[in-house]
């Protein structure tokens, strides 16, 4: 089972990496390289980056578990590769949970959300490459443009979600 809890703290939305990186990246990948069972599987999770998992003992030897920030998507990738999607679920753990927040770290890509984002992207791209997808310079160029458009579209949706739920939302900060 994969844990889930809402990412709302201090009257604003959290979960920036999932909202602003993973979900628009998956959308952009589908538009750029086409739909796949893997991308559909990843989209099926409300929050694919929650690190709380529980496993049956016999499952663990079948999983290659990474030691970087790509661990959550890596574990999901391994579950999708080795087991039927019907063998995993996502469970609401709490109404709220205060987890460790990372700094944005724009100037240092070895720290914080920059490092986390790089590790997550590498994990997803490697998984797709092992399935026979190739990523040329042109593919990455197209992916980048498609990702940016997808992220901007989602920001509009998040703005509406925040407004409907009485949460603060800073569009400039999100972009």
Predicted regions and their residues:
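Terminal low-complexity segments of carbohydrate-biosynthetic enzymes
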Residues: 103-175
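Short beta-strand-to-loop element that shapes/binds the nucleotide-sugar donor at the catalytic cleft/hinge
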Residues: 1-16
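Active-site phosphate/pyrophosphate-handling residues
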Residues: 20, 58, 74-78
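Catalytic donor-sugar/metal-binding loop of nucleotide-sugar-dependent glycosyltransferases
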Residues: 67, 77-96
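Aromatic-glycine-rich donor-binding/catalytic loop that engages nucleotide-sugar donors
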Residues: 28-69, 82
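Active-site donor/metal-binding and catalytic loop motifs
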Residues: 89-110
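Conserved Class I S-adenosyl-L-methionine
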Residues: 22-27
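A short, flexible beta-alpha/helix-coil linker loop
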Residues: 6-10, 60-61, 96-99
């Amino acid at each position: 089972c994969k844990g889930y809890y809402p990412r709302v703290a201090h009257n604003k939305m959290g979960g920036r990496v999932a909202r602003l990186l993973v979900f628009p990246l998956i959308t952009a990948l589908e538009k750029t390289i086409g739909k796949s069972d893997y991308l559909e599987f990843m989209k099926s999770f409300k929050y694919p980056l929650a690190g709380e998992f529980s496993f049956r003992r016999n499952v663990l030897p079948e999983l290659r578990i990474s030691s970087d920030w790509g661990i959550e998507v890596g574990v999901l990738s391994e579950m999708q590769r080795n087991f039927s999607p019907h063998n995993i679920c996502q469970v609401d753990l709490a109404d709220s949970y205060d987890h460790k927040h990372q700094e944005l770290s724009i100037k240092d890509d070895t720290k914080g959300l920059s490092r986390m984002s790089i590790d997550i992207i590498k994990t997803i791209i490697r998984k797709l490459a092992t399935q026979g997808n190739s990523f040329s310079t042109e593919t990455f160029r197209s992916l980048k443009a498609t990702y940016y458009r997808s992220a901007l579209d989602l920001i509009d949706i998040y703005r509406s979600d925040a407004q409907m739920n009485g949460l603060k939302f800073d569009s400039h900060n999100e972009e």
